[in-house]
Amino acid sequence: MLTVISPAKTLDYDTPPVTERFTLPQYLDDSQELIVQLRELSPAQISELMHLSDKLAGLNAARFGSWTPDFTPANAKQALLAFKGDVYTGLDAETLSEDDFTYAQQHLRMLSGLYGLLRPLDLMQPYRLEMGTKLANARGKDLYAFWGTRISQWLNQALTEQGDDLLLNLASNEYFSAVKRSALKGRVINVDFKDLKNGQYKIISFYAKKARGMMSRFVIQERVNDPQQLKQFDVQGYYYSAEQSKPDHLVFLRDHPAE
């Protein structure tokens, strides 16, 4: 089973990584093509394009300017440890074992507007470029056009390497839309996490994001390779709902959010 998750806007390059192992991103030629274009934008243009404050626009203009295709532990960090935010709070990668990292390297992928697709131990230089950004480029009107079917093809390769055709989608709609389903040679399993609020079960963004991270961790630590095993997920009060689920769309409910 191959799990895909979204990246995060929040990054941590201050905390030392808990593992010295690293790999290099596989699609840096594409990343560099985007960087060349992004460097042509002023901070004001970045602010308008990405809907950022002047401060954040300036920060990311500087990031694009200092980006280099030569990745080292001195200027980059393993992607799974660099990303922060709700999903990564739930995943809590800093407490994974070396064996867990080995498993994750084969069975987990992070979608990215700049890097396309990242493995957990791929070094990543800091950036901000959401997949939904309408950055016109030589390949089309936005990043979905830029990546085209590439991400699907790379996922097909990863599915082949890890031994089955099961793709667990724990990414947001914005990011999974970069996966062209017509080009994907795998069975996609979608998951929803719903919390009880005002008498109804609803998807609450903050809780759902964290739950995606917790399920990603569950898959890694339990070495899950069968959709039936996913139904055993019961972290922080979630439980599988057979009534609301379908074979390729699993629903988990929670009656009381964990403190």
Swiss-Prot record:
Domain of life assignment = Bacteria
Native species: Pseudomonas putida (strain W619)
InterPro entries of this UniProt entry? YaaA (IPR005583)
Q: Which PANTHER family match?
A: PEROXIDE STRESS RESISTANCE PROTEIN YAAA, PEROXIDE STRESS RESPONSE PROTEIN YAAA
Spell out the family assignment given in the record's similarity comment. Belongs to the UPF0246 family.
One Gene Ontology BP term is: response to hydroperoxide
This protein's GO CC annotations: cytosol
Q: Name one Pfam family in it.
A: H2O2_YaaD
Query: What protein am I looking at?
Result: UPF0246 protein PputW619_0896
